[in-house]
Amino acid sequence: MDTRGGTRPSGPLRGAPGHVVRRLHQAYAAAWTRHVDPVLTGPQFAVLMAADDFPEIDQGSIAARVALDRSTMADVCRRLEDRGLIRRVTAPGDGRRKLLYLTEHGSEVLTTVGERVRRLHEEMLAGDDTNAFLERLNGLVERWDSLADGASA
């Protein structure tokens, strides 16, 4: 998928952070589809990783860990469950909570896709100071989140 739209933006768009971030995400999503998996999405991969890292964690807690809202998380979990990658079990004593478990197939997919993700990230960040770059991106996320939550600009 060509995400470039034919030309590079000029003038004010090149200096508009929201536009640049959207373009970066478009390019990342296109690279993910081509080099990682055309069906499994980044958010789905994040949920699989969290389910693997935190066995028997509930769906709401994973949503918070991977920064997904409740309705998106419910859709992601339904899709993963439909593909046999996770199973959801009602928590004992609390019928509203769903515990997530990675299935054997989910574990296999996580291993395979995880290797592709690692290679993609190595290629994307080749030559860059990866740690400094990710620190800066995470700092921007925190700052922009605080602005979205009502902090003064």
Can you annotate each of these PLM segments?
Residues 1-39, 131, 144-147, 153:
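N-terminal leader segment of winged-helix/HTH proteins
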Residues 15-30, 62-63, 98, 102, ...:
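Extended, non-catalytic scaffold segments that flank or surround catalytic motifs
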Residues 22, 49, 64, 111, ...:
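A cross-family signal for key residues in well-ordered alpha-helices
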Residues 24, 28-31, 66, 109, ...:
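Alpha-helical linker/hinge and terminal dimerization helices associated
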Residues 26-72, 153:
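N-terminal helix-turn-helix DNA-binding core of bacterial DNA-binding proteins
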Residues 56, 78-135:
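Charged, amphipathic alpha-helical coiled-coil/dimerization segments
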Residues 75:
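DNA-binding alpha-helical recognition surfaces that contact promoter or target DNA
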